[in-house]
Amino acid sequence: MDNFHLIKIIGEGTFGKVYLAKDKSESSHCVIKEISLTKEKEASKNEVILLARMEHPNIVTFFSSFQENGRLFIVMEYCDGGDLMQRIQRQRGVMFSEDQILCWFVQISLGLKHIHDRKILHRDIKSQNIFLSKNGMVAKLGDFGTARTLNDSMELAQTCAGTPYYLSPEICQNRPYNNKTDIWSLGCVLYELCTLKHPFESNNFHHLVLKICQGRVAPISPHFSRDLQSLIPQLFRVSPQDRPSVTSLLKRPFLETLIARSLYPEVCSRRIQSHAHMENMAIGPTACWRVSPWSAAYLQRKFEAQQYKLKVERQLGLRPSSVEPHPNEGEKLQSHWEETKFQELQYRKNKMKDQEYWKQLEEIRQQYHNDMKEIKKKMGRELKRVVKFEISLDKCISEEDTVQENEAVDKLNATLSFEDGTKFQEHRCKEEHEDYTDRAFEELCGPEAEGFFQDVIAAENRRQWDAGAPHTLLRIMAMADVTSTCPTMPDDGQVIVMEGSVENGKQWWLDVPGTPCALAAECACSGSLSASKGETVMIKPQLPKEDQEKVEIATGIMVDDEQLEPGSDEDDIKFEESEDELRSEIIESLEKLAASTEEAEQAPSSSKNAEEPGEKEKTNLPVKKLQ
């Protein structure tokens, strides 16, 4: 580690940490992967061996490895574009173009083909293990920590390895698998590029396994081509034998045209040269990917030398135009070469412009996100409020209360059953009814309802009818200043002659027992009143004409104690009459009674007039005959 300068930690993998470092001797950036030998000794050695064997433009380049303090450090190529998962997350819902998706897919497939040709299973192909370099234009496959080498192309592996979202059905079902499990994972990566989400998602691992075993995914957007839409279902076939291999994928017409653009120019020239000498030379599997840096320049110099030789021979006359089978062939070749060179220059210029454009677009997008974060932070500071809590240290909270509170919280976190849901609905309906009642009460409590409440309070404070016998009339008669005289015509027809003048007549006693109230109390509301002295005489009250007939029918009925009991609600009439009205009616009846007595004293014949209907009322009063 002394030869490297560690800059920062850029990630943590399955078996250790990953550092961004700088080589002190070459001053170039690199990635150092730290692996603990005590935990994953075999896996770390396997990764070093496999990376040392991999030499491909679409596989992360291996530089060196060393051990230090019981740890293994692997020095690899640094990809400045990050991994593919980070690139997908930066899209924020904006879909990739189909050309970009297919370009990355072809490059990943080429790297995977290079692995499968060497009988190696990656077993952990995912977007986090695919790295981007050269401004995101080149995709490279990395992280061979879970890779395994097979002894035969027909051999099957049985170890469960990989990331749950990218597991194949045969691994989930604990069945043997081969290189077709990497094809399933490759389909998951392609689906993420098309939809920006996982093909199989679930919060539960058991449900996720069930979805993977079914192999059903939602179709991608119809804006993509039919070739791409039909390719994804083929990669997600449940049976491994039905899935295509990497070689058959790259032979598809719409993918084969992109291979030339995905490879470097020197790789293309090397492939052309290798095909030309395929019949005479036995080229190893790795030779086609080893490219000499001077091959393209050599071909160009050879072509220029041939053209210069033909030109000199023509000028010297050593090679006339008639000798040539095609006189204009040299000119055609020269024009063709110039045209291809011009096209190549234009392609490079356009590529540089595209790279600058994407770089500027990425800077603008990053600046926009930074500005939005600052605005949200400012808004959060403005909306932030302080909440103060006051805790009394004198009062001790019992443990039972805390246990009860925790139980209440647990009940809220628990799932509601059917009975709990029914009770919750009933309680909710009751609360809504109470809310409506409270709203109605608030409306009544408004300024318009103040008079209504005053009337209700006044009605509650009014005197009500008692359950006993009424004494209102008797009390008024007891308080009134009344004088009584004897009638001149008794029932037996004899005339009572009073001694002396009217002023010397017998007066009512002022004692309380002689009053009608006391007599009524002593007689318990009987039909007749007895005076303390003298004989008892029934005096009929004077009634109006319209009630005379009713009184004549009811005169022969004696009043019993049962009739004085309070009647039912149907017998009560006019409860709204006030005491003032009753008092005024009683006073009027008493005045009429007094006037009738005065007329009886002045005219002896007034007894006849009293018998006429509707003039006077007869009242039973106690009288005493004069001797």
Curated annotation (Swiss-Prot):
It is found in: Cell projection, Cilium; Cell projection, Cilium, Flagellum. CDD domains: STKc_Nek5. Residues 563-582, 591-627 are annotated as: Disordered. The keyword Signal does not apply. Residues 609-619 have a biased composition (Basic and acidic residues). The active site is at D124 (proton acceptor). Keywords: ATP-binding, Cell projection, Cilium, Flagellum, Kinase, Magnesium, Metal-binding, Nucleotide-binding, Serine/threonine-protein kinase, Transferase. It comes from the Eukaryota. It is an enzyme of class 2 (transferase). Its EC number is 2.7.11.1. Its cofactor is Mg(2+). Residues 563-580 have a biased composition (Acidic residues). The keyword Nucleotide-binding applies. One of its GO terms (cellular component) is cilium. Pfam families: Pkinase. It catalyses: L-seryl-[protein] + ATP = O-phospho-L-seryl-[protein] + ADP + H(+); L-threonyl-[protein] + ATP = O-phospho-L-threonyl-[protein] + ADP + H(+). Residues 4-255 form the Protein kinase domain. GO terms for molecular function: ATP binding; metal ion binding; protein kinase activity; protein serine kinase activity; protein serine/threonine kinase activity. Belongs to the protein kinase superfamily. NEK Ser/Thr protein kinase family. NIMA subfamily. This is Serine/threonine-protein kinase Nek5. It comes from Mus musculus (Mouse).
